[in-house]
Curated annotation (Swiss-Prot):
Superkingdom of the source species: Bacteria
Origin species: Glaesserella parasuis serovar 5 (strain SH0165)
Job of this protein: F(1)F(0) ATP synthase produces ATP from ADP in the presence of a proton or sodium gradient. F-type ATPases consist of two structural domains, F(1) containing the extramembraneous catalytic core and F(0) containing the membrane proton channel, linked together by a central stalk and a peripheral stalk. During catalysis, ATP synthesis in the catalytic domain of F(1) is coupled via a rotary mechanism of the central stalk subunits to proton translocation. Key component of the F(0) channel; it plays a direct role in translocation across the membrane. A homomeric c-ring of between 10-14 subunits forms the central stalk rotor element with the F(1) delta and epsilon subunits.
Cellular component annotations (GO), alphabetically ordered: plasma membrane; proton-transporting ATP synthase complex; proton-transporting two-sector ATPase complex, proton-transporting domain
Record Gene3D superfamilies: F1F0 ATP synthase subunit C (1.20.20.10)
Protein name, UniProt field: ATP synthase subunit c
Transmembrane regions listed in the UniProt entry: 9-29, 54-74
Keywords from the named record: ATP synthesis, Cell inner membrane, Cell membrane, CF(0), Hydrogen ion transport, Ion transport, Lipid-binding, Membrane, Transmembrane, Transmembrane helix, Transport
Site entry (Reversibly protonated during proton transport), positions: D60
Gene name linked to the record: atpE
Main location: membrane
């Protein structure tokens, strides 16, 4: 039973790490493309900024969903019931 709990915690940690990595890479690409497009067409900067903030919110949702799934696995582990 301890191995299942340990494996679940390690899996949740890996899930959080990849979610944070994906969010960081997504924000880096998003910011770079926003600056590039604003420099190319400055008159569209306000429109692009609104769209950038919407996409940034969706990128943050990835990390929040990963936190929720990890908390589910850590505190309400569904795999322990399979051992009984």
């Amino acid at each position: 039973m301890e191995t299942v709990i340990t494996a679940t915690i390690i899996g949740a940690s890996i899930l959080l790490a990849f979610a944070a990595l994906g969010t960081a890479i997504g924000f880096a690409i998003l910011g770079g493309k926003f600056l590039e497009s604003s420099a190319r067409q400055p008159e569209l900067a306000s429109s692009l900024q609104t769209k950038m903030f919407i996409v940034a919110g969706l990128l943050d949702a990835i990390a929040m969903i990963a936190v929720g799934i990890s908390l589910l696995f850590i505190f309400a582990n569904p795999f322990i019931d399979l051992l009984k």
